[in-house]
Amino acid sequence: MRVFVLANPKAGSHQARKYIQDIQKTYPQLDIKVYLTQGPDDEKNQVAAILKEFTLQDRLLVLGGDGTLSKTLTAWPVQYPFAYFPTGSGNDFAKSMDIHQLDQIMEALVRDKKESIFVLHSSLGVIINTLDMGFSAQVISHATDSGLKDVLNKIKLGKLTYLLCAIRSLLSHQAFNLSLEVDGRRETIRNLFFFSIANNTYFGGGIMIWPEAQASQRQLDLVYIEDAPLSQRILALLDLVFKRHRQSHRIKHVTGERVAIDLEETFILQLDGEMSSTNSLTITCQERFIYQ
């Protein structure tokens, strides 16, 4: 059996190469083909190279962070299953899916044991965790631009990046409006501080976005917080951190299977830790199969 390993060697604390060596040592019967990303957004190029040789009897294993996986799945054919093991700094998809042991993933891959999950599909690509606008997108933007994340990852404190950038974003946020259509129902939401469309339970390095949000179900979970004075914004975020979602009057929640968003102007957003921008976007549920 051939196993194509697509790995991001720079994700998180740079452990991908070590895991590849462990796999080669533990599973000598497998023909391991290694493809390493060479820079930002190189996943599509590596997928294209893999697909030139890939057959239905082969397997794909992705090693990297949430962004590596979502960009790989954007290029990976829907009908082909995949396996995943986290080597990033946030690893929210792995936490939500309870992916912790590499040997369990490898056994599922070898035995062709797979499960159906749903990801979010959009013109900007596949989303495995959340699409965020407002506060959380600003946090990721600050973390990316500052270079602080790379420094802290080297000393295994990558998650601290988000806390420091969150404080900065709290003090310099921009409220926004959006027109929203959920399963054909349209409304305008004004003066937003935080807006997220979730496919999974966690985002932002382990913060629960919504308790029932799961990739195993065909559902989008929309979570948003309206703008308010600083003290109220802090309380709303604390409601998220301390899992008071249902009790909080500050956190709003809507579900659906198809969401269309229109913004008054081009706005920055983050998809699984990667930055983008748009003023119009449609998101739907897409079925995939994962070895687990």
Task: Annotate each predicted stretch with a short phrase.
Residues 43-44, 68-70, 136, 278:
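Short, well-ordered alpha-helical microsegments
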Residues 182-184, 189, 214-217, 221-292:
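ATP/nucleoside-binding phosphotransfer catalytic cores, i.e., glycine-rich phosphate-binding loops
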Residues 1-60, 70, 74:
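ATP/NTP phosphate-donor binding region
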Residues 9, 63-65, 85-87:
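Glycine-rich beta-strand-to-loop/alpha-helix junction loops that act as flexible
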Residues 148-160, 203-205, 211-231:
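Gly/Ser/Thr-rich active-site loops/lids in small-molecule metabolic enzymes
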Residues 37, 79-83, 87-191:
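Catalytic core of DAGKc-family lipid kinases
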Residues 132, 196-210, 275:
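Glycine-rich phosphate/pyrophosphate-binding beta-alpha loops
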Residues 9, 131-135, 198-201, 227:
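Glycine-rich beta-alpha junction loops
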